[in-house]
Structure formats: C-alpha cells, structure tokens
C-alpha cells in the first residue's frame, strides 16, 4: 500500500543544466545521510523537486524543518 502524508514540505529548485541538478541532488543525499532523514527527490535537466515528511507520524516533525533549512542553505 502506498501512502503519502497530507502534510509535507516541498520545494522546486532550478539550475542551469543537468549536471548542476545532479550535483545538488548528491549534496542533498549527503546531508540526508548525516541527518538520518531522507526526502523524496525527483530531478532532471535544470530542476530538482524535494519533498519532506515524516512517514512514521504521517505528518511533519522538527526533523523535517531542520532538513529543509539545511537543504535551503546549499541551494
């Protein structure tokens, strides 16, 4: 069964090309591993979309906002 919380943080990021998008996603992955909290990410040529939620509580937690702030810092 697939589940998606009604409560989530989501942001679209734009870049000049695919490699910049890929580098951003790789950096998000590193931050996520450090935090132990992992977003859903989709990306392609010139864009990345990051969606953050806490599945265990079916909503938002403090960790979501911390991760979002750290991702914003590298964008």
Region roles according to the model:
Residues 49-74:
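C-terminal structural segments of small proteins and small subunits
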Residues 6, 43-47:
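Short Gly/Ser/Thr- and Asp/Glu-enriched loop/turn motifs at secondary-structure junctions
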